[in-house]
Regions:
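A short, small-residue-rich loop immediately preceding and capping a beta-strand
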Residues: 43-47, 102-113
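Short glycine/serine/threonine-rich phosphate/pyrophosphate-binding segments
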Residues: 53-57, 114-121
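Glycine-rich, small/polar surface segments that engage phosphate groups of diverse ligands
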Residues: 33-100
């Protein structure tokens, strides 16, 4: 069992090193979109399929309450997975359609091969003129295909659902931290 534990830690570290090498530009571009949306008075919506839903909710929470220091809340809403849509696949989309608009941003998280609710949310966001940041994995077969030229994909270099979930959490923390640092640079000096 000791070797198994060491093997899991090694795999975690290797995945993080690969992500650090591959994802820097995409993360910076996503953070810029997020900051620009917030500074221009836009709203940010986020959602995730299955295990990624918890990371989406966490992202909304830290964007509202602050991660690295106390600050005013950012306009971020986690879309509810249990919202009573007539068709389960449209749960997230039905929450975007009434209030999403040009200048808003949708952040989607997906750790699996398919993501019907996330895909319908993306279609709704695109129909409303919104931009999209997608945090995906190598297993993704749907989400990346819906992205436009101005959207951003952060594709985690793994198919292992545990490693992907770990990096999703790390990435949403990073996006929040980068946003805080850009919007409130004076807090870094204190």
């Amino acid at each position: 069992m000791q070797q198994q534990v060491k093997s899991i830690f090694t795999e975690c570290i290797q995945t993080q090193i690969a992500a650090a090498d591959l994802l820097q530009d995409a993360v910076m571009h996503a953070a810029e979109l997020l900051v620009n949306t917030l500074l221009n008075g836009g709203k940010v919506f986020c959602c995730g399929e299955r295990m990624a839903h918890a990371s989406a909710r966490h992202f909304a929470h830290i964007m509202l309450t602050g991660l690295d220091f106390e600050r005013p809340p950012f306009a971020v809403t986690a879309l509810h997975a249990d919202f009573g849509a007539r068709e389960h696949e449209y749960t997230f989309a039905q929450q975007i359609l009434p209030s999403g608009q040009t200048g808003d941003l949708l952040i989607v998280l997906n750790a699996s091969a398919t993501a019907p609710r996330v895909c319908r949310a993306m279609e709704a966001a695109l129909s409303r003129g919104m931009l999209i940041v997608a945090l995906t994995s190598e297993a993704d077969q749907q989400v990346a295909g819906l992205l436009g030229p101005e959207d951003v994909e952060i594709r985690i270099p793994s198919r292992n659902s545990a490693r992907v979930s770990e990096l999703l959490l790390q990435l949403v923390n990073m996006l929040c931290s980068l946003s805080e640092q850009q919007i409130f640079p004076q807090e870094l000096d204190e």
